[in-house]
Regions:
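Short, well-structured N-terminal submotif of metal-dependent ribonuclease cores
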Residues: 1-44, 57-64, 125, 131, ...
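Acidic, metal-binding active-site segment of PIN/NYN-like and related structure-specific nucleases
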Residues: 99-142
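PIN-domain endoribonuclease scaffold, especially VapC-family toxins
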Residues: 6, 29-96, 100, 104-109
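Short beta-strands and strand-loop turn motifs
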Residues: 12, 83, 116-118
Length: 145
């Protein structure tokens, strides 16, 4: 497991990496490279694994989707989505309920300080900071690309 700053990845960014979705995958690949170098810790919700499987099995096939998710599990810390997170998400007025679940899943880890997403305006600033992959990487001196 990687060390360093602990960041939460929204499902879209993980999918960019796993499915090599252009032009977004460059930034997603760079995030995973930092994790592989133990410069950051990537966190992903349990909910993302289900969503990713659903999408990846349509893009590829079920076996390849599972293989990609097994590799992903070796690179990330999985955050919880339980009763408390569902209750908190239901109590908010997010445009997208899945984003609310992601937000409260990220908050289960006290030292996650940012969600990396391509939909940063879907996350209320008063709950958690959200940045695009480009914004996050632009601030880092250890990103060599």
């Amino acid at each position: 497991m990687a060390a360093g700053d602990k960041i939460f990845l929204d499902t879209d960014v993980v999918l960019d990496h796993l499915a090599d979705r252009q032009p977004f995958s460059e930034y997603a690949h760079r995030l995973f490279a930092l994790a592989e170098q133990d410069k950051i810790t990537l966190c992903v919700s349990a909910l993302s694994f289900s969503n990713l499987y659903y999408i990846l099995r349509k893009l590829k096939n079920g076996d390849e989707a599972l293989s990609l998710l097994r590799k992903l599990k070796g690179l990330v810390k999985v955050t919880l989505v339980g009763e408390a997170e569902v209750k908190s998400a239901l109590g908010q007025n997010f445009k997208d309920f899945e984003d609310a679940l992601q937000c409260f899943s990220a908050k289960t880890e006290s030292d996650i300080y940012v969600i990396i997403t391509r939909n940063k305006f879907d996350f209320p600033k008063n709950l958690i900071r959200a940045e695009s992959p480009e914004e996050f990487l632009a601030k880092r001196k250890d990103d060599t690309r």
